[in-house]
């Protein structure tokens, strides 16, 4: 079977509970950002120090870099989806097996070489003071293919979500250059719209017409699951952690289930009946928009 391409849509109903998935031991207290880059496609922060262990990991995996993804609008921008729900953005933390391999370049040649942690970003009404430390560095890398020292004290632990239960599956890096095991925290961290919009002002490496282009979006759409791909989760409370406000009443749950059905039809027919697949994905987008607007209204009512 071919390797499962990343990203994917995680269907919580089909995820398999695995009691052997112990909590991760995250040791970012000694991690220090060294440089921040505008690659022309994304924002990358390189790190020195920091590692993860525990969980299902055979040994320590050291932190290499952080990548950030976003979309044109605040309501979509994540690579991975949870029950067809897209978050505002996504952070990927790339780690490599230092105990077994001599370098990152060597590690990525092997199926046990890379571990990527995914953290979702969700736009809210309040600024994230820890995420702001990254935003403050963006003016120094506004042009494509530029790099600058990360000149602020930054503690990566502060960007971890409040709940560290996780999904995991075997896939690839986002650019499909290497195999990778994914650890996905379904509980997002909150940021402000103004913070996310700053990323859309970065210049892209695309310059085919001689005019400046901006990285208005860089997320990837999900790939269909292979028949043998298994998604596992680490605990029962994960289902509660992935529940969005759009599922807090019967009608919204019904809309969400209908959206999932349409998305499954899209995945089923994309290789055959493309017309039917297009109709299905259009319904997915429409239902997603309705759920988003109803979710926003629910949040405002709850605050009031």
From Swiss-Prot:
Some GO term, biological process aspect, for this entry: which one? symbiont entry into host cell
Subcellular location field: Virion membrane
- Recount the UniProt induction comment for this entry: Expressed in the late phase of the viral replicative cycle.
What residue ranges are annotated as transmembrane?
Answer: 276-294
| Modifications the protein undergoes after translation, according to the UniProt entry | Apparently non-glycosylated.
Annotated ranges, domain Alpha-carbonic anhydrase: 1-235
Membrane topology (Virion surface): 1-275
Question: What GO CC terms are in its UniProt record?
Answer: membrane; viral envelope; virion membrane
In terms of InterPro entries, this protein maps to: CA_dom (IPR001148), CA_dom_sf (IPR036398), Carbonic_anhydrase_a-class (IPR023561)
For this chain, one GO molecular function annotation is: carbonate dehydratase activity
Keywords, in A-Z order:
Disulfide bond, Host-virus interaction, Membrane, Transmembrane, Transmembrane helix, Viral attachment to host cell, Viral envelope protein, Virion, Virus entry into host cell
Topological region Intravirion: 295-304
Q: Name one Pfam family in it.
A: Carb_anhydrase
**Family the UniProt entry places it in:** Belongs to the alpha-carbonic anhydrase family.
**Function text:** Binds to chondroitin sulfate on the cell surface to provide virion attachment to target cell.
The subunit structure is: Homodimer; disulfide-linked.
* Name by which UniProt lists this protein: Cell surface-binding protein OPG105
Q: Which gene encodes it?
A: OPG105
